[in-house]
Amino acid sequence: LHTAYRRQRQMCIRDRDYFETEQGLEQLIVGTYDALRVTKQYEQGPSTFMSGVDNFTNKTPNRGMYSPSEWNATGRFANWANSLCGENSKSLLGFYPIINNCNRAILSIREGKALGKFATDAEYAARSLSEALFNRAYSVYIMSTMYGAIYVPQGYTTELPSNYNYMRQSVPGIYSMLIGDLRYAYDHLPDVSEQNLSADFGRATKGAAAHFLAKLYLQRAQAEKFGTAEYGVDVNGNVDTSNPKSYLGMLYKGKGTADLDSCIYYASAVIDNGYYELESDFGKLFSHPLNDYSNENSRELILSCVYGPVGSADNGRFGNRLPYFFGGDYANASWGIPEFCWEYPTKSASRVGYTNDFGFDLYVNKQADSRYQKSFHVEYVTALRGGDSNSSPAANKDYYAYNNSSNATYEWTAEMADYFNEHILPGYNRASWRGRQAVAGEHKMGTGDLAFAYVENTKETAIDIKEALAQPFVLIARWIKDGSKYYYRVPYQASGKSYTYNDKSYGGLDKFGSTVCPATVKYDEPNRSNYTHYESGRDVPLFRLAETYLLRAEAYGRKGNYNAAIDDINKVRARAAFKAGETRAEVLARLQPGYEKLTQAEQQWPYEVEKDMTSTMLVDESYWDGGSANSKAEMYPETATTTEDRFVNFILNELARELNQEMVYYENLHHSGWQADRIIYHDQLASPKQGLWDNSDNLINGIGQTGNGMGMFEPYFTFKPFAQTMLDLLTDENGVLLDEAAKKAYQNYGY
């Protein structure tokens, strides 16, 4: 696939008949796999699909608050979404140019114009047609997820059209087309066991089509109740965009005869395939050490967006740039990591945002659910950048000893040292520490010691400020208490040669700082071409088996078969459990609330897990009964009033735990119909709700963690606005520009 990508990029200079030859058409079809890359190249993708979720907050306050200055037809979100589509782009990047190529391939094969093997080998032609149908379906699906009803071209063009009469096709019509195309693809794509993984890795398979179909059938069932006039939907499935509830009506996808059964059927085709299996260790899915790409061959992965090694000619201009938008900062000489290191994330100058409090709180039992530790950098060890070159990746080197003259870390104060020696040292046996006493004026951190770590606690479990300051590393906690005062995400600050906490300020909410909370591990790229570079060669998982299980679980639950749903849910949760012999992060074993339930041995270096936590992770129906402690811990929105409501929200919680900072979660949340409710009740910066959160004492002129929402979110923000530049381009069938009333009718409600 990589070599073909290179050849395809030369297509614009070829004669148009070339794409009816065997070689030309094959290159054209390979090029349509760019559909999977569109959202991974620039800021548009992560900014579009990480704004509008409930477990992540945009770092720019106006965007995170859903300010009308950003959410309008001329604002950033309209322009980002428009750039992903590419219908009036200056380049050939974007979904519409890809659909154009898909349509060309589809018509060439269907009309019998394709030559060579396409004309003589019916099976080969059907497989190739299926790939083009699959990639067109993916492109249309993502755009419909952004906008609802969209223009879907059926032909292709090699020149400017005579008009821009881009009529929006109803969502029921779109889903009927997608399902029909993907059912054809399912029948004609090869099974993964038949695929040449060395030559065709990354190409669509029968399993990918089945997973996609399961998702589409479930989404159609999820939105069936919105297909009425109350939500602006007419008998043909078209939506009146002047209706205030049209943000729900636009989710309506029609009604099949047995959509839930179809979801179960196609999900089962993947689950029972025999090839696909859950990775035994969740962390292995994202573990990407130096010169090790083995995680990309996991049998849990059904479809990935593939890249070659960094610098490959077939990676496009920058390759996968998600590390640049999701990475976390950590370089600080004062805690023993003086510069960016190869084995830690790259410099993230364009980070789009942060997991919010709800996103961390979803991991209810962090000592049992390994996904918290394996999804986030919860602690860092002191380190120096390895190697002698800025462009040759190398393993991190040990930082200086605590008593080395080159050590530049914070020093112990007398108060810190006294508390540490009396209350912490007697039970602190980290190997690198070697039992040393804290001495005022000596450096805190040295070789192999922790540099800094995070505690994601609650106001009720706030850590005392003396204990926090006396840790043998810099502790960054969500809640710290000082007597009767409670501080929310209080930032540390230098104080002489040591540090303290600045109780006159706060982090989080509208003041997210670069180290205020744990960053994701899912996009770390130690094999980058420069130690601060943004280009990556990592593959990006799009369909994986854990999601397939949860799709089927929701379908079972909606049919009332909770026992079958629980079996599928527990497959995913059992995998997530810490197993005996694994190692917990020190901060989890010593400080994160819940550590006190671990055995004494588990609270000691090397923090090895003694007790398998699988049984602790398994769920039953009490998790959505509305009254039990298990149910309340899931933090369902107040609008989830029935058993089915809570069950569906449990599935969304489980997807959020699995897919944190993976853009796939946006799709699940959006199509569920719960997107607006969950943002309002879960994302404090976005929410206009009052009194849902705890309040703190470290405010700035009355602003900060007051317990109130800080946002202006409106439910119609669940669909993106069409960009004004695109609306101004539209015409009727005669090429006459649309008037303002027609543009208003075309635009989604509220914009």
Regions found by a protein language model. Give the residues of each.
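Bacterial Sec-dependent N-terminal signal peptides
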Residues: 1-23, 178, 214, 553, ...
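An aromatic- and glycine-enriched ligand-binding surface/loop that stacks and positions planar moieties
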Residues: 6-10, 14-67, 207, 218-483, ...
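Conserved, well-structured interaction surfaces
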Residues: 22, 34-44, 63-147, 162-201, ...
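Long, intrinsically disordered, low-complexity segments
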Residues: 95, 177, 238-248, 253-255, ...
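Short coil/turn linking the two alpha-helices of tandem helical-hairpin repeats
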Residues: 144-151, 193, 219-228, 560
